[in-house]
Amino acid sequence: METRTEPTPSSTVPGGASQSIVIAIAGSGGDGVALMGDLLLKMAAHQGLYGMLVQSYGPQIRGGESAVILRVGDREICYEGDDTDLLVCFRASDLKRFRGSIHLHERSVLVMDEKDEGELPEWLGHGGREAYRHPFATFDGGVEVAGDPKNMMALALICRALGWSEALAEAAMRDCFSHKPALVDRNMPTFRKAFARTDVPALASLKGHGVPLFVETGNEAVARGAMAAGLQFFAGYPITPSSEVMETLIEELPEAGGRLVQAEDEISALGMVVGASFGGVPSMTATSGPGLSLMTEMMGLASMAEIPAIIVDCQRAGPATGMPSRTEQSDLFHAVFGGHGDFPRAVLGVFDVVHARDVMFRAFELAENYQLPVLVLSDAYVAQRRQIRDAVVDRRDRPQRHRWSSPADGPTRFSLTIDQPANPFRVPGTPGGTYMAAGIEHTEEGNPSADPVTHQRMSEKRFRKLESIAADTRTWVRTLGRADAPRGIVAWGSMYGVLQEWAAEHPEYRVFMPEIIHPFPLEAFSAWRKGLKDTSTVELSFQGQLHRYMAGLTDMTAVRSIARSGGLPMSKRELAELLAAPAVAATKE
């Protein structure tokens, strides 16, 4: 085998000269691609390395091509990188689905099966390089081996390339299959043989901190963040890509004294949440776009009756069924404006796995304090990624609802003269606190009313909550880059990872990322944009929903809209091309 120069890792983690390595594995259903990604991420975490794993798969229930992209480094990572340092591909034909997800640089290492004669796609960027050929099904002389030869050999060669030991791999396997030790015993001999005989170039060495770190998905972080914030009741209906929120809570919420119900549909799920919250219990549901559509009328009920309710929306691409396993940022309009009639709600966005816990605290704080629905917008890219993070020890106080205890706390449930954004909440069963909560317009006592003057005054009362929220959350933003940089980017949600690295590598840019989307932090935005030469909004939405939403709040005529449909997250390479391209129009109105 010819000698090749040691590959240079393709990406630098923000904050200095820290290096990271990007590995991709592509195969078909049954090849164990996802399992290998999970095992490698566990190995990184065991050493105190940081990392991030994203999966790419189709909407089919079983089978089809799948790929994982793993990036590991010695600092926190929330973007998978542009170029792959090591690609393991079981069949060239498996790569056809992953255009835009996997790209090689000039010194990448490519490993393929020795019997595969398929042609690599030009978009891969392989430049005609010769692949390292390995016998994924058999070893020297065609001798069959025990276990699953294909993925065990691939795992072994990746460990060799990274300089990771057999013991580390075995520890990760036993951790992953603690309930099936015999499975590990059956596969380890295969791994050891492959590890001893595999010949692959070494990648740059990465040294971890030595203290094991914690692996968590975005959905798991949302679930655990909600529990830490005081969640006691969850009702939901499974839907990709949010299902893991409920799956996590099924295992963990009852142990914390909470209750969970799998409802018959999304309408029922939010109805149960509103009912439980009416009973004084902090409650939440999680869904995706189609489910959010069904929940919208019930959102209006929560707002009209002034009942706290948390709705987590893990966005998928497209309307209707759309692309269930793909990401997009196209539910912003629905979250901010969806529903008949005028009713207030707050909307938050999730940046990454680490941020997800903080967002859930903020969501419960707003819901409990202001007694209204709060929507938390995640998406498939954040929800289903696996990210290595530091262990969490949360000592924050849980948000507490201001409860009514006696007439001294206010004469009526919906008093118009109270000095605070929301009236003290009357929990059913509190002596003297009986009232009617309904979706119909009502008087201060909760009695039905069709009086236009009452409707106007109650609407003003409900919407004053947004004024108070805007004042209390004006610092809920994150800015990246130099404060005096001449060029600006405005984005939200899962764009955070790529823009964090973009700002670190391009000092001419500053970035504005609101944690709260509605009400929008206009005061912070106005201060941030001063002195900018040019500004762009960047988002995964065909309509440019963020840009259009902001145009209704402030002058955006000089701000360029960079927007495309979702499906794939935006890379630094694509971002560079879009920012360099001539502007088609100054604004989208």
Give residue ranges: language-model regions:
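Thiamine diphosphate
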Residues: 18-99, 240-337, 346-367
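A short, gly/pro- and small-residue-rich
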Residues: 97-117, 306, 546-563
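Short gly/pro/ser/thr-enriched loop/turn and capping motifs at secondary-structure boundaries
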Residues: 58-61, 117-120, 139, 243, ...
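Gly-rich Lys/Arg/Thr-decorated short loops/hinges at beta-loop-alpha junctions or inter-strand turns
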Residues: 177, 196-210, 226-231, 249-256, ...
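Flexible, low-complexity linker and terminal segments
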Residues: 8, 215-219, 227-229, 359, ...
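Short beta-strand segments
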Residues: 89-91, 111-113, 287, 310-313, ...
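Active-site cofactor/cluster-binding pocket
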Residues: 2-229, 233-235
